[in-house]
């Protein structure tokens, strides 16, 4: 396994800095509830290192920092435009080939194919702030099927680090933007019936 992918079965709460609270909790549930007969859908996480690799491979870190550095922190008059431009930079990037290959290989291991749906869920991480909660600030996508839609959903999750509400939340709570990354959980969908 690379630094960019972690299986839920190998993730524990101590991994919050790498995979975020949501993915760490899923790893804990899979590890400790499965033996009690509680079924937890399997999955894997694209780590914060994978997020930064995507950002740096597309050479957009400085551009994003520049945009966030010009944010009007008093009235937030340019918040909407700042968020939009940051998201456009992320969505305009290209998935690094090796990262895409790793994601798709794990998707196949999970049983992913044209008819197998997964949830693609954001899980934010904050360096040196494992207690930080970003619940509800970032996007998740359900019933994703197929290679291209999966990679697009991962990119959309990465971009959701820069929604207006996520930027404002970090500003309101004193989190430095460059210290927050996004991990993405990819988990089997299960039918409710």
Q: Where on the chain are the PLM-derived regions?
A:
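N-terminal beta-alpha lobe that positions the nucleotide/phosphoryl donor
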Residues: 1-185
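Short, intrinsically disordered, charge-balanced linker/junction segments flanking boundaries
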Residues: 189-193
